[in-house]
Design a protein with these regions (language model features):
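Hydrophobic alpha-helical connector segments
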Residues: 60, 71-104, 117, 152-155
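Helix-turn-helix
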Residues: 13, 21-56, 60
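Short, well-structured alpha-helical segments
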Residues: 88, 131, 135, 148-156, ...
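Short secondary-structure transition hinges
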Residues: 95-143, 149-150
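Generic hydrophobic, amphipathic alpha-helix propensity
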Residues: 10-18, 35, 61-65, 69, ...
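Membrane-embedded alpha-helical segments of multi-pass transporters/permeases
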Residues: 162-165
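C-terminal peripheral helix-coil segments that are non-catalytic and often amphipathic
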Residues: 132, 171-230
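All-alpha amphipathic helical-bundle segments outside canonical DNA-binding/catalytic cores
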Residues: 84-85, 121-122, 139-154, 172-178
Length: 230
């Protein structure tokens, strides 16, 4: 078999086709065979040369989507906003970039240790970006002076691992109650991120992620937790 002279183009084509199918058919309904059938003659072997699985494709697609729409890049061009306002812009921009079906699928993958570890690493990196903006806010008076590093890390852990969580499963009412609790914590630290407008965005995120309204979800556990004996 001749070697592929353009591996990067092949990988890009697989990602483009996969994103199109995920959005049209849904992630769960799209199979590897569906992706291969839409690659214009490329084989299943070509797919597995670049990606280990459909889950691997989804992870890479999500990384590309959020890199293309990275609000931390565009915030550098914003003029006249203080540090707190910039953080709110980043937060709302990130929320508006969510693809509901893809994000729900990605959340389900966080039950797998490999993807959870990657999410933790991403959260660590994002906290560093928020730390810079928090320092700016502390300098301009929009955020109470304190430890910017700890505040950024705490905020990311609460929002990324407790509110939006593959471990602590919530229904809609509890999701909002958690957001209010986070608001109380951050307000107490002089970081008034979750104002009325941001709380509306939190509510929209809950809808986008498909957070259920019934209470049955409160008894559910992630797959790795079910393996732990009582």
């Amino acid at each position: 078999m001749p070697r592929n002279k353009y591996p990067e183009e092949t990988a890009k084509k697989i990602l483009d086709v996969s994103l199109k199918l995920f959005l049209e058919k849904g992630y769960e309904q799209t199979t590897v065979l569906d992706i291969v059938d839409n690659l214009g003659g490329l084989t299943r072997g070509a797919f597995y040369h670049h990606f280990k699985s459909k889950e691997d494709v989804l992870r890479t697609v999500m990384e590309r989507v959020y890199d293309d729409e990275d609000p931390f890049k565009s915030i550098k061009e914003v003029q006249g906003a203080n540090g707190l306002e910039k953080i709110k812009i980043v937060f709302s921009s990130g929320a508006s970039a969510i693809y509901p079906g893809l994000t729900r699928a990605a959340m389900s993958l966080l039950r797998q240790p490999r993807f959870l570890a990657k999410h933790l690493a991403d959260t660590h990196d994002t906290a560093k970006l928020f730390e810079t903006l928090i320092e700016e806010g502390m300098a301009d008076g929009s955020i109470r002076p304190g430890n910017a590093k700890f505040l950024a890390e705490l905020g990311m852990l609460l929002l990324n691992f407790w509110l939006v969580s593959p471990v602590f499963v919530s229904n809609k009412a509890e999701f909002i109650d958690k957001a209010v609790f986070i608001k109380q914590i951050l307000d107490g630290l002089g970081f008034t991120l979750l104002d009325e407008e941001m709380m509306k965005i939190i509510d929209t995120i809950a809808e986008t992620l498909g957070v259920p309204s019934d209470s049955d979800t409160l008894s559910s556990k992630p797959s790795f937790a079910k393996k732990i004996p009582p």
